[in-house]
Amino acid sequence: MAPRTTRKDQFLERVVGINRVSKVGRRFSFTALVVVGDGDGTVGVGYGKAKEVPAAIQKAVEEAKKSFFRVPRVGSTIPHLVQGEDAAGVVLLRPASPGTAVIAGGPVRAVLECAGIHDVLSKSMGSVNAINIVRGTVEGLKKLKSPQAVAARRGKALDEIAPHAMLRTMENDRAQKSAKAGA
């Protein structure tokens, strides 16, 4: 099933998967796994169940909006290598140079694109269950630390711990944000 992407109230919604379960005979129940983000570093994941598909998606979207969290980014990628795990699903996320794009499977791609990460390499290992992979990706993204936070924690200057290319990217991001704010 192709992922459905919609934009409501400036949020990007991606339906990762819909499952149909029959309880008794022809009584069906649907579950939906949805990722919601603003495309600028905020993302959340939700899981909804209902007797109709649209109701399940709506419940999942509401749950996803309640579980928003911030993802530190450097330019269009992540600051460092990270691994997230959930159940038997393991997701490895690696920063990539600009122009690489998102190299990831469907569930991981949905989370990263909704978070506004455009250049990253990923590898999913273990479980192929979409729920485990999405939760593993979220767990990995929650482990990310910004270069400023790492420098403050170590008691060092930012230029002592961050590569020069990363510092240039961060300066360019600040300049672009101030230009947008001034326009």
From Swiss-Prot:
InterPro entries on file: Ribosomal_Su5_D2-typ_SF, Ribosomal_uS5, Ribosomal_uS5_bac-type, Ribosomal_uS5_C, Ribosomal_uS5_N, Ribosomal_uS5_N_CS, Ribsml_uS5_D2-typ_fold_subgr
Example GO BP: translation
Gene3D superfamilies per the UniProt record, alphabetical: 3.30.160.20, 3.30.230.10
Source taxon at top rank: Bacteria
One GO CC term, this protein: small ribosomal subunit
S5 DRBM domain span: 11-71
Pfam families per UniProt: Ribosomal_S5, Ribosomal_S5_C
Keyword Signal in record: no
Keywords attached to this entry: Ribonucleoprotein, Ribosomal protein, RNA-binding, rRNA-binding
UniProt GO molecular function: rRNA binding; structural constituent of ribosome
Subunit structure: Part of the 30S ribosomal subunit. Contacts proteins S4 and S8.
NCBIfam families reported for this sequence: rpsE_bact (TIGR01021)
Function field: With S4 and S12 plays an important role in translational accuracy.
Domain-related comment: The N-terminal domain interacts with the head of the 30S subunit; the C-terminal domain interacts with the body and contacts protein S4. The interaction surface between S4 and S5 is involved in control of translational fidelity.
PANTHER family found in the cross-reference section: MITOCHONDRIAL RIBOSOMAL PROTEIN S5 (PTHR48277:SF1)
Family: Belongs to the universal ribosomal protein uS5 family.
Protein name: Small ribosomal subunit protein uS5
